[in-house]
Amino acid sequence: MSAGKIVQIIGAVIDVEFPQDAVPKVYDALKVESGLTLEVQQQLGGGVVRCIALGTSDGLKRGLKVENTNNPIQVPVGTKTLGRIMNVLGEPIDEQGAIGEEERWAIHRSAPSYEEQSNSTELLETGIKVIDLICPFAKGGKVGLFGGAGVGKTVNMMELIRNIAIEHSGYSVFAGVGERTREGNDFYHEMKDSNVLDKVSLVYGQMNEPPGNRLRVALTGLTMAEKFRDEGRDVLFFVDNIYRYTLAGTEVSALLGRMPSAVGYQPTLAEEMGVLQERITSTKTGSITSVQAVYVPADDLTDPSPATTFAHLDSTVVLSRQIASLGIYPAVDPLDSTSRQLDPLVVGQEHYDVARGVQGILQRYKELKDIIAILGMDELSEEDKLVVARARKIERFLSQPFFVAEVFTGSPGKYVTLKDTIRGFKGILEGEYDHIPEQAFYMVGSIDEVLEKAKNM
């Protein structure tokens, strides 16, 4: 191992000088004698490399000895990581002792080649009505949960992990990228209480950590997911929040002295996003289905960060503040959310017709709202009155009590099969439940519960 010394420290960016014949490669991990790990980002010439610190640079000083490990950052992978919380370097931070690692993989890997990739159109049932109906997930697809602050991205994600672990008994990897430590803690205890902790690996790089950690923690989680996939499993990979990954890239880019591009983002925004997203894919051995929470700055979907993310996704689940303000949770906007799987050749004609019928009625209701606001319901034709009545039932029937939100709602969570979901909405569209009051449709699971609830009203 060749040794160098620190020559300059600017916040999280550290310049290290090595002998001319032993300059580290880009992405090599370096170890400072204080125990801090650095990752080489640029070679400046004259034996000097510019690195990003994967940890706080407090207490560092010029002249400290730095050793080159001659390898990129390597993290433990395999079943020993399940039920554990790790940091960006794969070190345990849950005070449960060392991780008995089976093997270590480098976090920088190339994406699978074209011939290794598989294209599956198999659906992944989530048990959440609005998602299964309007924006179904593909096994091995990429899903984005879009929403501003406080509309329920993390709760939706927790419900998905719980449903996949319990109903499909699959493994999940959760990468907490630049989110609140409190959320990470809640998440851990929620998984523990739901008895699914032994099926989830948790990798955290929280808000208060340096930008290097937040930039690399998604790759650490992805590497663990790739290991499960290459063992022939169908694995779920959750990222909360992909926007913070971009933001960390912006911070690092500015510190490295690159010129900013639109809205101050890094010039390499599309490439950095591609490096992560291209590795999240299904091969002939197994699949990675990824669910990514995407914070939308100022609710503006045209911001370069969410806009770049859109290009990679198969399904987009858009959470809306208007729907949340009506008290309808999950606050998924059925008119804004899309899925490439919603195609009669993939989901079947019946599912497609019901989903489009639901969207059609909700769209018509949206148009009629202005007329109702000005002239009142009485001015509508009988046909339009029926549309409004059915739309309001559909709106309420799209809500659902979550298992992970039982504390807030006070009602037990419900998992609804796709068959029951289609049956329920088809019945509403065909007018079978026109006689039932709309309150009966609010916060229930299947249509049978609606009928049960209506009897007691």
Curated annotation (Swiss-Prot):
Keywords per UniProt = ATP synthesis, ATP-binding, Cell inner membrane, Cell membrane, CF(1), Hydrogen ion transport, Ion transport, Membrane, Nucleotide-binding, Translocase, Transport
Residues bound to ATP are G147, G148, A149, G150, V151, G152, K153, T154
Query: Which is a Pfam family this sequence falls into?
Result: ATP-synt_VA_C
Q: Name one GO cellular component term.
A: proton-transporting ATP synthase complex
What Enzyme Commission number(s) does the record list for this chain? 7.1.2.2
Q: Which InterPro entries match?
A: AAA+_ATPase, ATP-synt_VA_C, ATP_synth_F1_bsu, ATPase_a/bsu_AS, ATPase_alpha/beta_chains, ATPase_F1/V1/A1_a/bsu_N, ATPase_F1/V1/A1_a/bsu_N_sf, ATPase_F1/V1/A1_a/bsu_nucl-bd
Q: What class of enzyme is it?
A: translocase
Membrane topology value: Peripheral membrane protein
- Its chief place of residence is membrane
Record's catalysed reaction(s):
ATP + H2O + 4 H(+)(in) = ADP + phosphate + 5 H(+)(out)
- Is ATP-binding set as a keyword in this record? yes
Q: Name one GO molecular function term.
A: ATP binding
Cellular localisation: Cell inner membrane
* Family per similarity comment: Belongs to the ATPase alpha/beta chains family.
Q: How does it assemble?
A: F-type ATPases have 2 components, CF(1) - the catalytic core - and CF(0) - the membrane proton channel. CF(1) has five subunits: alpha(3), beta(3), gamma(1), delta(1), epsilon(1). CF(0) has three main subunits: a(1), b(2) and c(9-12). The alpha and beta chains form an alternating ring which encloses part of the gamma chain. CF(1) is attached to CF(0) by a central stalk formed by the gamma and epsilon chains, while a peripheral stalk is formed by the delta and b chains.
Q: What does this protein do?
A: Produces ATP from ADP in the presence of a proton gradient across the membrane. The catalytic sites are hosted primarily by the beta subunits.
Protein name according to UniProt: ATP synthase subunit beta
Naturally occurring in which organism (per UniProt):
Haemophilus influenzae (strain PittEE)
